[in-house]
Regions:
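Residue-level signal for the nucleotide or nucleotide-sugar donor/cofactor binding architecture
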Residues: 11, 37-43, 67-71, 98-101, ...
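Amphipathic terminal alpha-helices
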Residues: 117-148
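NAD(P)-dependent short-chain dehydrogenase/reductase
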Residues: 1-44, 80
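Generic structural signal for alpha-helix termini and adjacent loop/cap motifs
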Residues: 23-27, 52-56, 127-131
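Structural element of the ATP-grasp superfamily
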Residues: 20, 106-107
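Short, hydrophobic secondary-structure boundary micro-motifs
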Residues: 31-33, 61, 89-92, 136-138
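Mid/C-terminal beta-alpha module of Rossmann-like enzyme folds, strongest
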Residues: 48-105, 145-147
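Amphipathic alpha-helical segments that line or abut small-molecule/effector binding pockets
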Residues: 43-54, 121-125
Length: 148
């Protein structure tokens, strides 16, 4: 048995980066209700989860799967703004706390993500610039009260 907790896998059609990039591109304020996020490219998440099958056990093998370092929402917006040629607009102030996963056990047992967040930012912005289809479903990553 394995218990896997996945935090914000990224896809070009859906995810935290799509939410932020669309806001930046469209001139809408980026909500700083959550100051940082744990994110991972979906391909890496699938790879690491499959590797975890070698570790299933009783009691359950427990694993957090996401990026190894939290990423600032402000930094993501500024970086994607640069790629999109738009200065981001922000709403609110980033709190000092965030829902972040500790993925050190993941790194020790099944490895590190291979695709950098910077690369996914570039892919996401190019996807949106070429009118790539999105799922149109926000992640609500910035919500702190659990009401989506």
């Amino acid at each position: 048995v394995a218990t896997i907790r996945l935090s914000y896998a990224l896809d070009l059609r859906y995810g935290v980066l799509v939410d932020i990039a669309e806001s930046v591109r469209d001139g809408r304020p980026v909500d700083l209700g959550m100051g940082a996020v744990s994110v991972i490219w979906q391909g890496d998440a699938c790879d690491l989860i499959l590797r975890s099958l070698d570790h299933v056990s009783t009691p359950p093998f427990v694993l957090n799967v996401s990026g190894l370092q939290p990423v600032s929402v402000t930094d993501l917006a500024v970086g994607m703004g640069h790629l999109l040629g738009v200065d981001p607009v922000f709403e609110g102030e980033a709190p000092t706390t965030a829902l972040i996963l500790n993925c050190s056990r993941m790194a020790q047992t099944v490895g590190d993500p291979e695709v950098s967040i910077r690369r996914v930012m570039d892919w996401t912005c190019r996807w949106l610039q070429t009118n790539g289809r999105t799922l149109g479903k926000p992640t609500h990553f910035n919500v702190r009260d659990g009401k989506f």
